[in-house]
């Protein structure tokens, strides 16, 4: 596929994403700010989890051109678009996050400094999400950061009033923002992909792989599930850095190993000729 054609499809992808996520760019900016501040590096190794066609990764590279971005996804359509448009800057790797052995397929030789994801992990079941977070902790360096931008809701089982109010506010805001005919939808974009002769074979492959079949798992859209799973996986601090309603940027810091007390020097407390004890 020619890069120009791929970029046109990605532009349409970005527009249809912005229809339901008006603050998408603001969340991207906040996430990249956090990567920059948390790593303190000009050349971090960053895993873009559920990367799609590379919308987040290419924005991160605009801010941090020295970064190495590894995009991982199982979708053959968006991977093909990303490789054609941004393959010279992002390393796109076909990985199914439901596969417990996914870290072995990463084209890296050291732990990552950061892992990022936007609007992707909500399709995993709770069991798959917990397993993914456990393996993610193993591929991040101690002190590394994980950032997840997504709609994560309050748990109706433990906070029923907050959950109901949050969803009501989201629905009311959607009604104000999205009148009839507001733009191309997620379904409309994929219908166009399927109808395109150049992309139809990849769309058929996507369907055969069952990619996105569990989209919007009821468990993985709950904030409490992500927080609990991250802490259980060994992330020391978990909290929200940026938020607009249920649309939030969740941050987790990989637990660093405990610092061992320094062994006492054999000279400690010994009298030094010509001086006192040191």
Predicted segments, located by residue:
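Conserved class I S-adenosyl-L-methionine
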Residues: 1-42, 55-59, 147-176, 181-185
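A short glycine-rich, Lys/Arg-flanked "PGG" loop and its adjoining helix->strand segment in the class I
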Residues: 130-142
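Core SAM-dependent methyltransferase catalytic element
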Residues: 233-278
